[in-house]
Design a protein with these regions (language model features):
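Transmembrane signal-anchor hairpin modules in multi-pass inner-membrane enzymes, especially those
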Residues: 1-271, 277-281, 304-314, 379-387, ...
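Transmembrane alpha-helices and membrane-interface helical segments
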Residues: 203-209, 237-244, 294-301, 372-379, ...
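Long extracytoplasmic/lumenal interhelical loops at the membrane interface
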Residues: 341, 446-448, 454-469, 473, ...
């Protein structure tokens, strides 16, 4: 009933808009512009390139790398260990948690937190902190009511978290003891750290039930948690994936076309950390990159399907939508800016950054998400879902505009161009005139900012040019191997070349990578991009429906790397993690389609 009313309302609004003067005026301009545009040499060239690409029969080659062999060996050993020690308490606990319903897990977590809060209440009451102990007592009572409500299946909560399995006395005792032990750490760790430990235990227990919850938490952490906590969630996710694979009844290792390149990059990162000019400074970037490559290898081994990836995409867009709303609020209230974020002569008063360090990093994040919105809009048939996606995308796009990040805008445009070009050229040719007309409707402040792209009158552009010149000098002195992984290595070596400033990085991803890991390392990063392009192209020809999601992830990477021509985009930990997460998603979708086609071919043969 609701969907019917919603559809009628949307149809009425669309009809009203189509009959309005504004729509007719701009549509007439669009038709005239479209006529000139389609007759241009640019369009003819696009069709020639598209025909060449479409006619190519590229099939990505797969071979097991050394990293694959090592990981396969470790995972098989883990599975054997699990099978041999299934009666051990720790493994039994993991298996039982996986078999529990969400209602039961929520109930036992409620008991654990109730006991922890009760112990905290007693300890603070003994210290004389009666106000805090009263608050903790109320919190303890609240968590106990959650436990009792779900255990007895009474109240409102069981309507949302159904529990069919019984809670045993042993399980109650185990979680109560866990709460007492966690509370016992309070005098040693302090309230903040002890509470973080308790919440960490709840998180680990919850995500052990379902790996996708760990991945969802990881996506959420990238936007809303500090770097250190995000890294903690990331490594918990890796542990949960390992446990999930180890608990499988059967296991078949998946090999993909990028395995060898990932292994080579991992080797380069390792060598350039050991031989870095600032070894301790390189460790941060090594942990982020090596951990992410391990995540990709493990992520590919999970039993995933395209529906799970749809949920991941929805959650990525939803979290970006929340960040986008926060950015819009910042723009409305006029959040204070740092002096280095904008040229004093530009007239810009506010640049939004949401939960990120600065507007450029926020733009890097947003432009990676936007192409996923295109993929959902094309895949979804329901008008309601399309409108919701469009609304969320509108908030994300508005926030991107308010970052006033020129590199971000260029990246977003490149991502849209690539997505539509690879998906369907006719859609791109319709989009370009609409985009050009849309430019005329943008505020003057945004148009002025766009016009300053490449202008040496702009202080930030002039500064970048100077840094690029010095970066090229460093590359000439360390051409093949670079100076060491990470921005700290760049900072240390650049002090010998740049005396008038102290830049954190080269303000260009390609120059920065060449400085850090040499031209050889940069070559293999580019090779990884080309390999991913080949995989996306192949899947689009084989299964366009699933390939569309894959294309959304790839266009997000391209958006980021185009932005990388004016900024070092692989500097912030969260962007590094998201970059490799996207590579992992492309790799996993490729693996899913490959497996489905093999099963289909086997059925036909039999």
């Amino acid at each position: 009933m609701t969907s019917t009313v919603f559809r009628r309302l949307s149809d009425t609004l669309i009809l009203w808009f189509k009959n309005s003067f504004i729509f007719k005026f701009f549509y007439s301009i669009y038709l005239k512009f479209k006529g000139y545009f389609e007759a241009s040499y640019f369009v003819k060239l696009m069709y020639i390139i598209k025909d060449k690409i479409t006619s190519s029969e590229y099939i990505p080659k797969e071979s097991m790398s050394i990293a694959d062999r090592v990981l396969k060996f470790i995972l098989e050993k883990l599975r054997r260990f699990f099978n041999k020690n299934k009666e051990a308490f720790s493994i039994q606990l993991i298996i039982k948690i996986k078999d529990m319903s969400f209602g039961k897990i929520a109930s036992l977590n409620g008991l654990f937190l109730a006991v922890y809060a009760l112990i905290s209440t007693i300890l603070y009451a003994l210290r004389g902190s009666y106000n805090l102990s009263l608050i903790l007592a109320l919190i303890s009572l609240g968590f106990f009511l959650v436990f009792y409500s779900l255990k007895r299946n009474i109240g409102i909560l069981p309507n949302f978290l159904k529990r069919k399995d019984e809670i045993s006395k042993i399980e109650i005792a185990v979680f109560a003891i866990l709460g007492i032990i966690s509370g016992g750490f309070l005098p040693v760790l302090g309230f903040s750290l002890a509470s973080a430990l308790a919440l960490g235990i709840v998180f680990l227990i919850t995500v052990l039930k379902e790996t996708s919850l760990a991945v969802g938490s990881y996506i959420f952490a990238i936007v809303f948690l500090p770097d250190l906590l995000t890294l903690l969630v990331f490594f918990i996710t890796i542990i949960v994936i390992c446990l999930d694979i180890s608990n499988k009844k059967s296991f078949e290792y998946n090999v993909t076309p990028i395995s060898n390149i990932l292994f080579i990059l991992l080797s380069i990162f390792t060598i350039r950390t050991i031989l870095s000019v600032d070894r301790s400074g390189s460790i941060r970037d090594f942990v982020l990159n090596a951990g992410s490559i391990l995540f990709i290898f493990l992520w590919t081994q999970l039993d995933l399907n395209i529906e799970k990836f749809k949920k991941i995409v929805y959650f990525l867009i939803f979290t970006a939508f929340l960040a986008g709303l926060y950015g819009i609020v910042q723009y409305i209230i006029g959040v204070p800016m740092e002096s280095g974020w904008v040229d004093p002569n530009s007239g810009i008063e506010t640049r939004v950054f949401a939960t990120f360090e600065n507007p450029n990093i926020f733009a890097e994040y947003l432009i990676m998400i936007i192409p996923l919105g295109y993929a959902l809009m094309i895949r979804e048939k329901k008008m309601k879902t399309r409108i919701i996606t469009l609304v969320m995308g509108g908030a994300i796009f508005a926030s991107l505009l308010f970052t006033f990040s020129r590199g971000g805008w260029l990246g977003a445009g490149a991502g849209a161009f690539l997505f539509l070009f690879m998906y369907q050229l006719s859609m791109l040719l319709k989009f370009i005139p609409v985009a050009l007309i849309g430019l005329m409707l943008l505020p003057a402040s945004i148009l002025r900012r766009m016009a300053s792209i490449g202008s040496l009158d702009d202080a930030s552009n002039f500064y970048r040019m100077q840094i690029w010149e010095k970066s090229i000098e460093i590359i000439k002195d360390y051409p093949l191997t670079g100076v060491g992984l990470g921005f700290n290595s760049f900072r240390k070596i650049s002090a010998k070349y740049i005396t008038e400033a102290d830049p954190y990085h080269a303000h260009n991803t390609y120059l920065e990578l060449a400085v850090e890991i040499g031209i050889i390392g940069l070559f293999f990063v580019v090779m990884l991009g080309l390999k991913l392009l080949g995989m996306v192209h192949h899947i689009l020809k084989v299964d366009k429906h699933k390939g569309t999601l894959m294309l959304g992830f790839f266009a997000g990477l391209i958006s980021l790397m185009v932005h990388g021509m004016a900024e070092h985009v692989l500097y912030n930990p969260k962007i590094i993690l998201l970059f490799w997460f996207y590579v992992g998603c492309i790799n996993s979708i490729y693996s899913i389609v490959k497996k489905e086609r093999l099963e289909y071919e086997n059925i036909n043969v039999n």
